[in-house]
Swiss-Prot record:
Cysteines joined through disulfide linkages: C163-C168, C181-C269, C185-C271, C250-C263
Alphabetical list of SMART domains matching this protein: CLECT (SM00034)
Keyword tRNA processing listed: no
Protein name as it appears in the record: Killer cell lectin-like receptor 7
Membrane-crossing residue ranges in chain numbering: 45-66
Keyword set, alphabetical order: Cell adhesion, Disulfide bond, Glycoprotein, Lectin, Membrane, Receptor, Signal-anchor, Transmembrane, Transmembrane helix
Membrane topology: Single-pass type II membrane protein
Record Gene3D superfamilies: Mannose-Binding Protein A, subunit A (3.10.100.10)
Gene Ontology molecular function: carbohydrate binding
């Protein structure tokens, strides 16, 4: 009986200890649940507050970025305005530099200006020695110069010369061969006329006599080409292919065209010379 009691008592003790443990383990759970419930409400408030704060920070950063962008744009526009002002408004140094360049340029141009003044004086001097030979010529600047007896050689042939621009022209109405006209021009320290360009050709055709006149263009058999008497260059564009050298090796001028013919024929002589080639 005693062993059974001990055994029984042992079993009861063991069960009671388990019950006590169960009771002990169950007792602290209630305050934990209460504690969790107590702390869960403030944590949600903190999260909401942090979210609002982050949103405000994002809005602030966005506003700052927009402000900085606008400021940079305004600064860029201001810089462009200043650059344009600097480029468009000459500074004092630029003005001084331009003045210096103008002074240097005027010094460089003085020889040319002196030459132009000299030519102008020569032209005025030649014009002062001339007289108008026709009413129509008054609008063209054409003037006739009286021919001396020595120049006319007493033959009474009509002669006149006129200056236009930088060139002077001498018309000798005494008909001569091409070689005779060349010699006549050389006696007067002139040369048979060389036409420099198309404008001069048209001008001479309007004022030339109705008769054909010899000019200083002839065919060179050695060069196989048409050359001017002084071998100088000319900007006059000539279609030399249309001139058949069998018709003649010397060129003449009429009111309508240039034409080649027999050099032994007798035509009017046209001499010419530039004003800057006359002796002072």
């Amino acid at each position: 009986m005693s062993e059974q009691e001990v055994t029984y008592s042992t079993v009861r003790f063991h069960e009671s200890s388990r019950l006590q443990k169960l009771v002990r383990t169950e007792e602290p759970q209630r305050p934990r649940e209460a504690c969790y419930r107590e702390y869960s409400v403030p944590w949600k408030l903190i999260v909401i507050a942090c979210g609002i704060l982050c949103f405000l920070l994002l809005v602030t950063v966005a506003l700052l970025a927009i402000t900085i962008f606008q400021h940079s744009q305004q600064k860029h526009e201001l810089q462009e305005t200043l650059n344009c002002h600097d480029n468009c408004s000459p500074t004092q140094s630029d003005v001084n530099l331009k003045d210096e360049l103008l002074r240097n340029k005027s010094i460089e141009c003085r020889p040319g200006n002196d030459l132009l003044e000299s030519l102008s004086r020569d032209q005025n001097r030649w014009y002062s020695e001339t007289k108008t030979f026709s009413d129509s010529s008054q609008h063209t600047g054409v003037h006739e110069r009286p021919i001396s007896k020595a120049e006319g050689k007493g033959r009474g042939f009509e002669k006149y010369w006129f200056c236009y621009g930088i060139k002077c022209y001498y018309f000798n109405m005494d008909r001569k061969t091409w070689s005779g006209c060349k010699q006549t021009c050389q006696i007067s320290s002139l040369s048979l006329l060389k036409i420099d360009n198309e404008d001069e050709l048209k001008f001479l055709q309007n004022l030339a006599p109705s008769d054909i006149s010899w000019i200083g263009l002839s065919y060179d058999n050695k060069k196989k080409d048409w050359v001017w008497i002084d071998n100088g260059p000319s900007k006059l564009a000539l279609n030399t292919t249309k001139y058949n050298i069998r018709d003649g090796l010397c060129m003449s001028l009429s009111k309508t065209r240039l034409d080649n013919g027999d050099c032994d024929k007798s035509y009017i002589c046209i001499c010419g010379k530039r004003l800057d080639k006359f002796p002072h």
